[in-house]
Amino acid sequence: MFLAALVFLFVLLMSLPFLVPHLGVLALFGFVPLLCMERVASMEGMKRVWIWHYSAFVLWNAVTTFWVCNATVGGGIFAVLANAFQMSIVFGLFRWSKKLLKGSLPYILLAMLWIAWEKYYLTAAQISWPWLVLGNSFATTVSLAQWYEFTGALGGSLWIWACNLGLFGLMVALSDGSWFRFNAKAKLAAAGGYLAIL
């Protein structure tokens, strides 16, 4: 039940920026519930976790791109399922990398793989599906994304991943007690670094 709540929180936080004007800031911590879900599942040794993250991506795609069904219902359903499958592959590679890499490296790899996938999808793929590029969540919050003229929407995707991973890292440090072993300078650097990203 807890994992389902995290999935629905992820869907809510990541859908609103694409549906409601001026809510792009929600994307800055929208992936945290999905990362928490993955952490809980890993700590519990759960099997078939892909069902949870694939379901999360299907729901997110369905909520934000439901309008494609106005053109063709079959095409809309296929687009939702196929795009969610691709997102799930990226997330699955991240989960697999956690078996090989330790510390923060799998999380950095997750951000890199996601942005590389978005870049491929925008430029080289036969089908372009730019609606759910993470950086596009600020499409109606232009005042926060003036620097997009230099980085494009993928720079926004990097910003979103940096914020999500930074917040998740702070939450993990607090929950496992490592935050309390940091000296004052390390705490100030961690909190200050996260605030600078915001």
Positions of the model-derived regions?
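Membrane-embedded alpha-helical bundles of multi-pass enzymes
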Residues: M1-L198
